[in-house]
């Protein structure tokens, strides 16, 4: 039997195994090092090993070091209640420590000698300032640092003798200043799309206790004294009742507000908003990057909703729809289902240029009825309207503007998405009310949005119109003044029309005038359902920024919702106005977004065509690199 063939194995020397192993490890480590260095280059940027890299602008190398003035001389004005003066300063200390920014509390004498390495000076109610202290503040600003002040700062000398408003107006860039002590609580309305807007809703109406307020006459204030409908108090211009401003003074940044920064203990939600305003002011004054998400798509600065209430007079409404269609604008028509069922073709025409929504079954208020009774009527109206034209009926306008706390619950039970709410205005943008959809899935929420009517409707304006019998430009101006106010806030303007009032043919020229002006502005004109779709998707997006080197800022955008968000913009407040900007993604599959440097406040607008659901985006912003 033949022996099986065999092969001889070659034995490599042990040194060869060691050589190949070492070479393989060296190659692997080299590749990992190259990848790591590429990642560093794509995030931190080029760096020097033996020397520190110099920034193009010193603001990029500064940290946050806060000095708070505890002014005993100013406290003497509160001799009967010294604690009232100390409370705002103590709140500043608590807020800063909670943020991880331990402040340095200084005396009047220390302020007069200089501020050392501080980058932000806080002056809570420092009315009494001596000559040396004023000089220190002016030098501090000339060095490009930041000051945050409140109340009648600098209106008295070191002996607390009255000196006038010159120091305050010079500090803030205001034309004039005054004091005002209301007898009751008053409302303060905050502008939107500003550096503090991440947690303060646009047009937020904040009630503050009766106190001595300091008012400025200043252009483009961040907050102003208002009434319940977010209108400037006493019919004055917004600029004449300014309660908060931010301003560039020389090379420095100034934030000022004229109200107390503490609220009663039971107002914890509103207090957290004020605390956020304080912290955001510190970051902005210290020239740290801040990112906020824009309110509206396609670079628009506000939104407008054309709402037509159709009751009985469908002929006027049909003519009105033809006018709006000729203007190329969408509108939302609110109909009660009883009348709409008899005018099916008209309702289809309304739907073709926008959206049909509900006024209930009969056009009578639901206020005061039990939630179940309200829900049954709302559900029936929804079914009847959807039989006329296929499509979802998602919106409801309370007849005569009357609703109660049960209405929003009934709307959710009946499958609606929004209410055009007139009562209890809280802000200039939609307020989302969520409901647990299932006890087994507590994190799944149904949402109903309140769209507040923060402007007068045609009934109010026509009732107060005293112009010529033939409508003139003055009548259109009554609507447009409200539109400009809401646009300034960055909110939603509701152009609310009754078919039997402004829908009459003799007012068509006025309507066309108003619509032409709205269309010419950077305002997103849309329907109620589209507005709510956008706002609920936007509400799930978070943005954040941080400085990672003397030339680079990291921008993080996360869409945590289940719907894509299209044509959104992020406004990035930069430490300074760079000459050259580049934006790159740290993930190679992401495209770099388009961007534009705005001509105020060192703001970089970054535009995103789509933010996909459940997706995080990280970009590096390179400044003068």
Residue map of PLM features:
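Aromatic-Pro/Gly-enriched surface loop or interdomain linker
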Residues: 16-117, 263-265, 280, 284-287, ...
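Metal-dependent polysaccharide deacetylase catalytic core of the NodB/CE4 family, i.e.
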Residues: 155-156, 161-163, 301-304, 321, ...
């Amino acid at each position: 039997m033949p022996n099986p063939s065999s092969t001889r194995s070659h034995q490599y020397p042990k040194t060869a195994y060691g050589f190949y192993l070492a070479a393989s490890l060296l190659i692997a480590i080299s590749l990992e090092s190259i990848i790591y260095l590429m990642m560093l280059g794509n995030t931190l940027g080029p760096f020097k090993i033996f020397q520190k890299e110099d920034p193009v602008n010193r603001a990029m190398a500064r940290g946050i070091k806060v000095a708070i003035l505890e002014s005993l001389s100013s406290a003497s004005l509160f001799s009967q209640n010294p604690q009232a003066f100390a409370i705002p300063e103590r709140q500043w200390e608590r807020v800063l420590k909670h943020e991880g920014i331990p402040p340095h509390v200084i005396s009047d004498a220390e302020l007069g000698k200089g501020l050392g390495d501080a980058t932000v000076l806080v002056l809570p109610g420092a009315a009494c300032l001596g000559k040396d202290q004023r000089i220190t503040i002016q030098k501090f600003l000339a060095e490009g640092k930041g000051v945050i002040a409140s109340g009648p700062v600098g209106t008295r000398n070191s002996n607390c003798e009255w000196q006038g408003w010159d120091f305050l107006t010079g500090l803030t860039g205001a034309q004039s200043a005054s004091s005002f002590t209301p007898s009751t609580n008053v409302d303060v309305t905050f502008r939107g799309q500003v550096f503090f807007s991440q947690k303060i809703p646009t047009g937020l109406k904040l009630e503050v206790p009766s106190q001595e307020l300091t008012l400025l006459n200043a252009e483009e204030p961040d907050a102003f004294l208002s009434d319940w409908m977010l209108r400037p108090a006493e019919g004055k211009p917004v600029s004449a009742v300014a309660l908060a401003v931010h301003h560039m003074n020389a090379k420095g940044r100034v934030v000022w507000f004229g109200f107390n920064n503490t609220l009663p203990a039971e107002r914890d939600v509103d207090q957290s908003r004020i605390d956020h305003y304080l912290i955001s002011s510190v970051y902005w004054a210290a020239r740290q990057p801040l990112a906020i998400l824009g309110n509206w798509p396609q670079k628009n600065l506000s939104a407008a909703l054309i709402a037509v209430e159709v009751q009985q007079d469908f002929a006027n409404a049909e003519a009105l729809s033809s006018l709006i269609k000729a203007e190329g604008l969408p509108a939302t028509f609110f109909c009660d289902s009883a009348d709409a069922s008899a005018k099916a073709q008209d309702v289809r025409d309304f739907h073709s240029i926008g959206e049909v929504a509900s006024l209930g079954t009969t056009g009578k208020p639901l206020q005061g009825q039990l939630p179940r009774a309200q829900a049954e009527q709302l559900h029936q109206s929804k079914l009847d309207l959807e039989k006329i034209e296929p499509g979802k009926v998602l919106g409801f306008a309370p007849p005569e503007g009357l609703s109660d706390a049960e209405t929003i619950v009934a709307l959710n039970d009946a499958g609606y998405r929004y209410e055009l709410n007139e009562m209890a205005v809280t802000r200039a943008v939609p307020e989302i009310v969520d409901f647990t959809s299932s006890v087994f899935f507590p994190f799944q929420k149904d949402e109903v949005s309140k769209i507040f009517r923060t402007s007068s409707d045609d009934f109010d304006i026509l009732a107060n119109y005293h112009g010529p019998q033939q409508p003139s430009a003055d009548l259109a101006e009554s609507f447009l003044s409200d539109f400009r106010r809401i646009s300034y806030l960055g909110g939603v303007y509701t152009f609310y029309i009754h078919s039997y009032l402004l829908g009459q043919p003799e007012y068509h020229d006025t309507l066309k005038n108003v619509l032409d002006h709205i269309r010419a502005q950077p305002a997103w004109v849309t329907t109620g359902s589209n507005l709510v779709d956008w706002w609920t998707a936007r509400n799930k997006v978070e943005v954040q920024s941080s400085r990672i080197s003397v030339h680079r800022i990291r921008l993080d955008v996360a869409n945590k919702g289940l719907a894509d968000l299209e044509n959104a913009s992020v406004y990035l407040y930069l430490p300074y106005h760079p000459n050259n900007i580049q934006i790159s993604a740290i993930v190679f599959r992401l495209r770099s977004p388009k961007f534009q440097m705005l001509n105020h406040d060192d703001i970089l607008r970054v535009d995103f065509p789509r933010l996909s659901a459940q997706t995080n985006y990280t970009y590096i912003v390179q400044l003068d690199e």
